[in-house]
């Protein structure tokens, strides 16, 4: 072995492999499913750790340079004196080297493929290690990098080993020629940018480094080199077959044994020699064989019933000794498209899916097992059954967990060229076919044995080109057991088995040039269109969003070929950063000084970065629930329908509860024994009491799982519904005797007094300016009309990110003058009545000399010390629909709790309230604020009948919010952690509130039904303060 490295570092850098799309690797081993090379059958069967694997994670030596040419030659032989330590796996940007960049479409480098900037941040990693002396004596020792972003060179003991790019698939090299007894030294030079970066333009943080596991694997000299497992099913799924195509690295007289296990018990086995059937006139393969093992009455795998077997593949010597064993979890299932429907095991699927980026707030793109399990448990608990690996192959452990817990997976190639113009510039260029091909073929070769993967995806947002057509054909030939999907190319793309648009709407066409997005209802009815439609992205959950999600699910359940979709997306991609005082906060694009950046567009999650749910997650849970209910109010019969396709209920109980104005009056439960796709009815006539008290009567039902499962705790609620029960009784409100309030007025004020209470209107503005109780003022600001909200991301659209969008709601409101309204009182008069005081006020709201709104109020102060407010608002025809119509003020009181009768307990809005349950709720004041990372309107509770907050008691039919943060602060503040509690409590009382929208976040997406587009609105409220003892 030469003591001098060859080629030299200078020679390697002169080749500029990282700017050559035809060069994706040097000396990298072929892709294959994950290997463990057990030497013991029982260990393989039981999935024990393998003694043939050595993990190299931990602290490595690290030196950072602004370009690869700055790396000194001596680093190949020994660490630099100023080297630091850096954890592997990690992203070096999160260790204060370089800056993470968040951008959606725009490339973070000048667009000139395949060239990348000369200033190309470079991380030089090294570490010492030793290996078992037996590994040096025999066999092959490999090093496996599960993920390195974006390209790297590898040396061992000063000798160049190889080069690789594609940041999301393993790079595996043979280290055997370079290893030595005692200490060995690895050196890895990682480049931030390479030509492959043009294929990795996903909507995510752009970070670098060795961010997945690094390990050594020792294989025997003669070893298994590839294993392909399929599970064909026959006779209406009553018979199955385990088929294993096994490859060996070199022709030999060895034999291979295939065994199938279930719960540790042997189901069947077969042993045979290598050698295939005759392929053509030149003969057969000597280095492979196919074993077929029949299985009677196999237990089928699905996301509902993720039954797994364990297959062991043992390489035997000619004498019958075990050379090595590989093992895989096996699920018997069949995926097909027939009659225009995607089916699993013969049943049409309804995809309850989400897109998921690999993201951790502290660790960036480093995934650990605990985070992966947490994500899966949350998905299962909230009725998700599918996940799209957006937009790259995930950590290999992810698929094993999805196999075991039960999630359908779309495995997606690491290809996105969204920032190219046109988008298909690279995908239609044969020069880029080798690079694209390796990203697809190596994904399939690594992941094909996982039952959870039901669809392959050719990538994301790369237009449509001839390269896609070639890759589609390759996948269909190599794996005919799964469909292929790809969104690019518009309505007529042939490179997909599934219509998988993003952000197509339920009823609204979006006729974009070349790539129209028809409404999903229309799409499945186009001439000669017979494919299923599954939205690859929909319901953009950016901040306070997700409005109209229920409309999609109404359509999915109504039209069989609308088979669901994948919500965008799972987790807010914010990173933890510390402010100047060392306090941590969640940072988004631009917070690291990164350019270009797309600010908060990375905050689209159903969960916060720490996996705390957004309110939208509950909306998804309710819409996607596997049990549907109907209630016949005439016969008082409840019917429950199971949407499980394969699972019989064996751990479900149906609970019912009758509530009068939120107070329980009767309850009961039934055992729920339902076959898949069946229903059962439960008569409640004999169980419901006769009630004569006034109030709203609600029937609540829920399905709970009494016993804990692999993914939920005991008594997990998995479905619910409720109905307002009709009542024929009418009740007159009781008469209340008491002294009438007294009126006094002068040129400046109108004052009303009742006992220990006093109210005051000021004539100059016509507002209720103060409310005293026992001479203590209760208001910090007057009670005023409110027609605006702190803009949501959906209100802003693409304004303030790339350009001003005149169609965005916030721009339309600005142009109309809604943020600079001048309020003018045109009427304020008061009258003493026999039983109270009446005040009538009228206000005009003007901008640029035009009257935009007119608000007329009638205030009745009664003998109970309460004030009833009747509000009428007229809206000018020229005004765009306002965000809200209501009243607001700043209360002096700060109370730790609020109680209300209405929809809750979590935040809800008029177009996102499917998951909000009518009842009597109590929550801490701080829980009424939803801490969206980018502040805006939040915390609303709709359809409220009564609100108790400290001494305040408010009745009517209204929406409310209570917050320590005022509207102006919410409008002006850029981050949640910068919000400062204000004096008192801000109270908003809305008679009407516009929806939040959510079909997407860059165009107006609030459905017409939830816009305040009328010309006149009326609402009523009753406010009272409790007498203090």
UniProtKB/Swiss-Prot annotation:
It is an enzyme of class 3 (hydrolase). InterPro entries: B-gal_small/dom_5, Bact_Beta-galactosidase, Beta-gal/glucu_dom_sf, Gal_mutarotase_sf_dom, Galactose-bd-like_sf, GH-type_carb-bd, Glyco_hydro_2, Glyco_hydro_2_AS. Binds 2 magnesium ions per monomer. Binds 1 sodium ion per monomer. Keywords: Glycosidase, Hydrolase, Magnesium, Metal-binding, Sodium. Mg(2+) 1 binds at residues 416, 418, 461. GO terms for cellular component: beta-galactosidase complex. Its EC number is 3.2.1.23. Mg(2+) 2 binds at residue 597. GO terms for molecular function: beta-galactosidase activity; carbohydrate binding; magnesium ion binding. Na(+) binds at residues 203, 601, 604. One of its GO terms (biological process) is lactose catabolic process. The keyword Oxidoreductase does not apply. Belongs to the glycosyl hydrolase 2 family. PANTHER family: BETA-GALACTOSIDASE (PTHR46323:SF2). Homotetramer. This is Beta-galactosidase. The gene is lacZ.
């Amino acid at each position: 072995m030469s003591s001098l490295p060859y080629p030299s570092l200078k020679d390697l850098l002169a080749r500029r492999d990282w700017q050559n799309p035809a060069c994706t690797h040097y000396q990298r081993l072929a892709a294959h499913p994950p290997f463990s090379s057990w030497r013991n059958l029982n260990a393989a069967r039981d999935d024990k750790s393998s003694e043939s694997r050595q993990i190299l994670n931990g602290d490595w030596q690290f030196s950072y340079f602004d370009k690869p040419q700055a790396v000194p030659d001596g680093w190949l032989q020994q660490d630099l004196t100023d080297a630091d330590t850096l954890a592997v796996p990690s992203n070096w940007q999160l260790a204060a080297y370089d800056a993470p960049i968040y951008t959606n479409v725009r490339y973070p480098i000048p667009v000139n493929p395949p060239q990348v900037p000369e200033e190309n941040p470079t991380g030089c990693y090294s570490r010492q290690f030793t290996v078992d002396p037996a590994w040096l004596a025999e066999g092959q020792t490999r090093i496996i990098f599960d993920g390195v972003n974006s390209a790297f060179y590898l040396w061992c003991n000063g000798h160049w080993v190889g080069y690789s790019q594609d940041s999301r698939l393993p790079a595996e090299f043979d280290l055997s020629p370079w290893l030595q007894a005692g200490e060995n030294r690895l050196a890895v030079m990682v480049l931030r940018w390479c030509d492959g970066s043009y294929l990795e333009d996903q909507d995510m943080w752009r970070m670098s480094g060795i961010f997945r596991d690094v390990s050594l694997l020792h294989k025997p000299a003669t070893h298994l080199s590839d294993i392909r497992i399929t599970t064909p099913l026959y006779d209406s799924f009553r018979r199955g077959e385990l088929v294993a195509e096994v490859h060996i690295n070199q022709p030999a007289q060895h034999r291979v044994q295939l065994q199938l296990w279930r719960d540790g018990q042997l189901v069947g086995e077969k042993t045979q020699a290598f050698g295939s059937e005759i392929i053509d006139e030149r003969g057969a393969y000597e280095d492979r064989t196919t074993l077929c093992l029949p299985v009677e009455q196999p237990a089928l795998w699905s996301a509902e019933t993720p039954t797994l077997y364990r297959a062991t593949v043992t390489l035997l010597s000619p004498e019958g000794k075990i050379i090595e064993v590989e093992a895989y979890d096996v699920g018997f299932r069949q995926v097909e498209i027939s009659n225009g429907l995607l089916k699993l095991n013969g049943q049409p699927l309804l995809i309850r899916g989400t897109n998921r980026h690999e993201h951790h707030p502290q660790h960036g793109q480093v995934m650990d097992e605990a985070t992966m399990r947490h994500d899966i448990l949350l998905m299962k608990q909230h009725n998700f059954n599918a996940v799209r690996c957006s937009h790259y192959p995930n950590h290999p452990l992810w698929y094993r967990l999805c196999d075991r817990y039960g999630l359908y997976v779309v495995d997606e190639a690491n290809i996105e060229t969204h920032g190219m113009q046109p988008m298909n510039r690279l995908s239609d260029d044969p020069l880029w076919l080798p690079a694209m091909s390796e990203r697809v073929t190596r994904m399939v070769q690594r992941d094909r044995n996982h039952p959870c993967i039901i669809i392959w995806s050719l990538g994301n947002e790369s237009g449509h080109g001839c390269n896609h057509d070639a890759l589609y054909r390759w996948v269909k030939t190599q794996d005919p057991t799964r469909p292929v999907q790809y969104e690019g190319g518009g309505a007529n793309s042939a490179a997909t088995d599934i219509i998988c648009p993003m952000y197509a709407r339920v009823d609204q066409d979006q006729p974009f040039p070349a790539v129209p997005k028809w409404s999903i209802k229309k799409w499945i009815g186009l001439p000669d269109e017979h494919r299923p439609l599954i939205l690859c992205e929909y319901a953009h959950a950016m901040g306070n969003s997700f409005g109209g999600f229920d409309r999609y699910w109404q359509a999915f359940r109504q039209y069989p070929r609308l088979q669901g979709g994948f919500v965008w997306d799972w987790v807010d991609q914010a990173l933890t950063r510390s402010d100047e005082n060392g306090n941590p906060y969640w940072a988004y694009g631009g917070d690291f000084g990164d350019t270009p950046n797309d600010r908060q567009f990375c905050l689209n999650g159903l969960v916060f970065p720490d996996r705390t749910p957004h309110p939208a997650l509950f909306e998804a849970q309710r819409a996607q629930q596997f049990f549907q209910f109907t209630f016949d109010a005439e016969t008082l019969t409840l019917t429950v329908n199971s949407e499980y396709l394969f699972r019989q209920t064996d751990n479900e109980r149906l609970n019912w509860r009758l509530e009068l104005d939120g107070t329980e009056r009767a309850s009961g439960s039934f055992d729920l024994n339902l076959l898949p796709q069946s229903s059962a009815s439960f008569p409640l006539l004999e169980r419901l009491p006769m009630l004569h008290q006034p109030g709203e009567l609600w029937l609540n039902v829920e399905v709970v799982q009494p016993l804990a499962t692999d993914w939920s705790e005991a008594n997990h609620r998995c479905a619910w519904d409720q109905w307002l029960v009709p009542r024929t009784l009418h009740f007159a409100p009781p008469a209340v005797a008491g002294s009438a309030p007294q009126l006094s007025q002068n040129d400046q004020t109108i004052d009303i007094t009742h006992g220990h209470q006093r109210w005051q209107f000021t004539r100059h503005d016509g507002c209720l300016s103060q409310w005293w109780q026992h001479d203590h003022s209760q208001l910090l600001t007057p009670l005023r009309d409110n027609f605006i909200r702190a803009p949501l991301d959906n209100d802003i659209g693409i304004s303030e990110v790339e350009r001003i969008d005149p169609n965005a709601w916030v721009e339309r409101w600005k142009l109309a003058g809604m943020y600079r309204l001048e309020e003018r009182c045109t009427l304020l008069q008061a009258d003493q009545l026999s039983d109270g005081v009446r005040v009538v006020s009228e206000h005009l709201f003007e901008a640029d000399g035009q009257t935009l709104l007119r608000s007329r109020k009638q205030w009745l102060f009664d003998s109970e010390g309460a004030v009833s407010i009747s509000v009428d608002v007229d809206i000018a025809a020229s005004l765009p629909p306002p965000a809200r119509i209501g009243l607001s003020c700043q209360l002096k009181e700060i109370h730790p709790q609020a109680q209300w009768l209405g929809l809750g307990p979590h935040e809800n809005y008029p177009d996102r309230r499917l998951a909000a349950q009518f009842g009597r709720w109590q929550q801490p004041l701080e829980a009424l604020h939803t801490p969206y990372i980018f502040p805006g309107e939040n915390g609303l509770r709709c359809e409220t009948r009564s609100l108790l907050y400290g001494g305040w008691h408010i009745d009517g039919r209204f929406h409310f919010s209570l917050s320590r943060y005022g509207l102006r602060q919410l409008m002006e503040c850029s981050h949640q952690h910068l919000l400062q509690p204000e004096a008192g409590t801000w109270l908003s009382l809305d008679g009407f509130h516009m929806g939040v929208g959510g079909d997407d976040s860059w165009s107006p997406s609030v459905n017409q039904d939830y816009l305040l587009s009328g010309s006149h609105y009326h609402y009523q409220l009753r406010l009272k303060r409790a007498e203090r003892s």
